[in-house]
Amino acid sequence: MHLLITSAGRRNHLISCFREDAASLNLPLRILAADFRPEFSPACRQADAHFAVPHCADSDYVPTLLKLCREHEVRVLVPAIDPELPILSAHRAAFAAIGTHVVVSGPEAVAVSQDKGRTAEVLLASGIATPRTLSLADYLHAPKRLQHPVIAKPRTGSASQGIVRPNSAEELTTLNPQDYIVQELWEGREFTVNVFFDRAGRMRCAVPHERLEVRAGEVSKGVTRRHPQLEEVAWRLPAALSDAAGPLCFQAIVRDSGEIAVFEINARFGGGFPLAHRAGAPFTRWLLEEAIGCQTTAADEWRTGLTMLRYDAAVFFDE
């Protein structure tokens, strides 16, 4: 079976998880990887084959991937970064027509996850607490509507890029009001919850881990925690994201008082997924089981208290 990871970048851990799970299923799996510059992608170097594709914003991106999937009989396509999610979600039917299942949520869940303003609105409408949020324009008009301290975030940003922690509203006047939202800044323990939905849209598992240390927006030290209140929030996600599918993750703050606020949703594999995988929630195995039509082993059974400490590794190759 052929599996393709797009925008593979540094997702070597994802390749390793798929290989480990394919071996446990006795499944011959060939992993392909695609990137804008695959020669400088560590994950592409680890894959069985790699391919150069246009940037996901290019009009040739989808036709190129369709051609690649058709020629190599790709059964499963796994997108790795946020910008390609709405594009691939919108073209799921075209890929399905050639026998390729795209591991991505439906357009609504993707749209909600990619707009922090909409994320806050949908969470509140579903009864899930989130920090009080205003558009930058509304905040500048009436900053006292939010309790300080506050944090300004790009509406569609990721990896903690572009975040501003202002001391006053005046410090935000140079930002584009259309591009930013402003939230009350909660202090507390930060968690990510990795969540898995099967192809029928049923949520099967939720694995919280505490983010002990973060680097460039991705957890570098973390530990799995059984947290009933956080898990209860996770199991309410299907009501908020009716067309969710595959892996998702969300981030939350837990105050010392026990209050919980969700402030971000990612409709893809989270960077900290290897911790959930090692703890006994192999989303990658469950995706392979779905692809080959065998009975799923998906279950909400995993180890609490498992710690992950990350370090840098290198890939070497001759020119």
PLM regions: where:
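ATP-dependent carboxylate activation and anion-phosphoryl transfer catalytic cores
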Residues: 72, 228-319
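Preference for protein termini
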Residues: 1-34, 72-73, 199-201, 242, ...
